[in-house]
Amino acid sequence: DVGSAGDSDSIQITINVGEFNNIRHLTANRDLQIFTTTSELYIPSFADKGLTPTNTQIPRQTPYGASFVKPLPFDGATLYVQKTGKTIREYLFSDKESAYVSTPLSLISSHLISNPIQMASVKGAFDRPEQYAFIINDDGSMAVFHSIRNEEKAGFVKWSTTGRYHSVVAIDD
């Protein structure tokens, strides 16, 4: 009986967003984030206790949907490809809204995003605060997103090669 679950039982919960959804990704960042075909949701985490059947809730946050490309924790947020394959979004908790927001990062650089197939990132370091996200498109091109959040600097650039990019991996120091 799911209704009488104890804290040590499995979590079985229905995500009630009014439409059929397939979960595409679970990402651990500030909270456990859920990216589906039509929505972005999260399971709030608690500093003093773990997730249990008695304290789990899943509020819907944004209505965009995610592609099959794995989301990336990036510069305090989570980057993901919107289900259309044309937009890179930043899923970030807004204290002002008391909710997660999904800001389109690639809006003015949409010509650099074409059905991404893979993403990787290099985190900042003590001597290098900037972070980079490498986005491989299905046409073999690569877009690179650069961000320094605390200085409010960010932007996309196209990386060119004589051939095509097939895959990308980032190895931090």
Placement of each model-derived feature along the sequence:
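Charge-patterned, long linear interaction tracts outside catalytic cores
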Residues: 127-141
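Beta-propeller and closely related beta-pinwheel folds
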Residues: 1-129, 144-171
